[in-house]
Amino acid sequence: MEPLQRKSELDFQSYRKMPLAQQRTQRLKPTSPEELHDLICVGFGPASLAIAIALHDALDPCLNKCAPTSGWQPKVAFLERQKQFAWHSGMLVPGSRMQISFIKDLATLRDPRSSFTFLNYLHQKDRLIHFTNLSTFLPARMEFEDYMRWCANQFSDVVTYGEEVIEVLPGKSSPDSPVVDYFTVLSRNVETGEISSRSARKVVLALGGTAKLPAELPQDPRIMHSSKYCTALPNLLKDNNEPYNIAVLGSGQSAAEIFHDLQKRYPNSRTSLIMRDTAMRPSDDSPFVNEVFNPERTDKFYNLSAAERERSLKADKATNYSVVRLELIEEIYHDMYLQRVKNPDETQWQHRILPSRKITRVEHYGPNKRMRVHVRAVKDGKDSLIGDGKEVLEVDALMVATGYNRNAHEQLLSKVQYLRPATQDRWTPSRDYRVDLDRSKVSAGAGIWLQGSNEQTHGLSDSLLSVLATRGGEMVESIFGEQLESAAVPDTRFRAML
């Protein structure tokens, strides 16, 4: 064996024996806040985490034969408002499972050789064989969140938690520069209130959703969004054996899960599920329909006309919006049936479903200091009455499961709106998620990307986990493609062996 080849094999074996965490920290290194970054990601949820993983893998010589081994190092930072990594912590309902296959993790569909796959997580946790014995593709939601936290922990050197980004400002390398060539990201420490400033040529906004609450609901600490169910409700209703009255508003998966879980969490309570629809409807996750979440469908959707996109979103609505997994519907129906066996009068049931209803008014204080929720029966989504049409519920808490808004980026980008093309009055992402900017005002090396807020242009899967692995790779190519290519090392026998 030639000396070079022997040394290469030894280097390779040495690399393979390194702890996984050590391998990863070599890929992305911390950058001083005072330095100009290549990239700042605002938010460090699953979308940004998928970008971090894809960038790590692009720099890994075991996965990318042309990965730079020395010289260029990306200067990246991730800013996250939460104090630690968390994914829908308020909806980690006991017993809840994922609604997608674990194969749609943060890496597998992009490159199953990645060390960030769900299967490797199980291997590292010494649970792979035990998980296999479950014979399921749908892990517990709690376990999948732990998987993502395990991934996130490998990037602690480049993530700053407890930093809420408040503004993105334009920046010029010199006062005389005719164009903006970087952006300044201002953030506030959530504990101290201290304002920090970082600059980057490229900025990704991956902010996630913000709670959507119906306008007719007043502000009251006893009215809370479903995203706070597991974290805030236990602080409000502290005695699990107390006979509380609790109402849930909504007809989707979150509403159904909360309604079902309340009956176990507070066994002596009375619960009501209020919905405008006539019944809970099952989600359609059949194989052909489920192809709407295939990564390649993003290309097809993006190339549709605006009218065709609208029709497509409407046709695919049953896969994600205001629908419930059939197994849960059947379990809830069984519980309702057992109540019917005991008493045919539904108005006397401990747990009730109120379909074709809407909340018209909420009084803060009624008898026993409970809220008075005024409910009105509707027909076909209109205000026409059914029967007497009115009912008043006295409740200790109202859980609102009415979805999320995904427009938080608009406020953060208000100071750079003038950089949009004159013909556009909104932020318009291209296929690679980079928003259109007036290039007479912004240099080619500077840009802004949006994640999770592009359903109207990129399809139903834009805010979901299904495409994150593939999209993470697309984002790295869009943001760092030229730098990776220019820093690439030509193939050697060592690289060929890998």
Swiss-Prot record:
EC number: 1.14.13.196
GO molecular function, a single term: ornithine N5-monooxygenase activity
Effect of gene knockout: Essential for viability. Grows only on siderophore-supplemented growth-medium, but shows decreased conidiation.
Residues annotated as binding NADP(+): S251, G252, Q253, S254, R276, N320, Y321, S322
One Pfam family linked to the record: Lys_Orn_oxgnase
Enzyme class: oxidoreductase
Segments forming a coiled coil: none
Pathway where this protein functions: Siderophore biosynthesis
Assigned protein family: Belongs to the lysine N(6)-hydroxylase/L-ornithine N(5)-oxygenase family.
Protein name from the UniProt record: L-ornithine N(5)-monooxygenase
Species of the source: Emericella nidulans (strain FGSC A4 / ATCC 38163 / CBS 112.46 / NRRL 194 / M139) (Aspergillus nidulans)
Protein encoded by which gene: sidA
